[in-house]
Design a protein with these regions (language model features):
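His/Glu-rich zincin catalytic helix
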Residues: 1-72, 180-197
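Charge-rich, well-structured scaffold segments of protease-associated domains
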Residues: 10, 21, 67, 72-197
């Protein structure tokens, strides 16, 4: 036994929650994860196969941080005295915060952030430019190029060979409809897991 207590529940909407109390920790950490990563570009929905451009999970990660009024959730977390971030991997996308106060408010804000999203042509176009610049920065890193070059040689023609952020070309192909469809599929509570430590 490692002496840890873990509380688990699954809500009626399907969201799974794990709580790991740490009495000797001053800071609280919350992370919500959806089972949607960069390899999820070919999806079967109601027997119908759909193909999406590489980088869509990462693009959606960026857009989830913007509320319906175009305001940045990062600033809302700062207002609560917490830090927040997000990341996309091959198999998941996660959003997180760390704080020393206002824990219920931070959890509520995290849940609010991943429960609704708003897209406009202008905001998607702006984000597309930001992500394309980000891709350029990644490609300037020798370690990054070596890692994804190895994956491309090991798994040619598969989503594992694609950059998690996509390519400049694939990002240009992502539409508002693509983003909305993937949000509706993967940001449902039944596809998500909340962990609070």
């Amino acid at each position: 036994s490692v002496g840890e207590q873990v509380y688990f529940t699954r809500l009626s909407n399907g969201l799974t929650i794990h709580l790991i109390p740490k009495e000797d920790y001053y800071e609280t950490y919350g992370i919500i994860t959806t089972k949607f990563g960069s390899v999820d570009t070919r999806i079967i929905v109601n027997g119908d196969e759909r193909q999406y451009p590489a980088g869509i999970a990462h693009f959606l990660e960026h857009k989830v941080f913007e509320d319906e009024n175009g305001q940045d959730y990062l600033k809302k977390f700062v207002h609560l005295g917490s830090e927040s971030n997000a990341f996309t991997s091959f198999t998941k996308t996660s959003y997180l915060f760390s704080t020393t106060s206002k824990i219920p408010e931070n959890i509520q804000l995290l849940l609010e952030m991943v429960s609704k999203v708003s897209f406009t042509e202008k905001s998607v176009s702006k984000e597309r430019e930001i992500i394309q610049q980000e891709i350029g920065m990644y490609q300037d890193s020798p370690d990054y190029r070596l890692f994804f070059g190895a994956l491309d040689n090991l798994y040619p023609g598969t989503p594992l060979a694609d950059d998690i952020a996509g390519t400049r070309e694939s990002i240009s192909d992502i539409t508002i409809d693509n983003l909305r469809e993937n949000f509706d599929l993967f940001y449902h509570p039944s596809q998500m897991h909340l962990l609070v430590i």
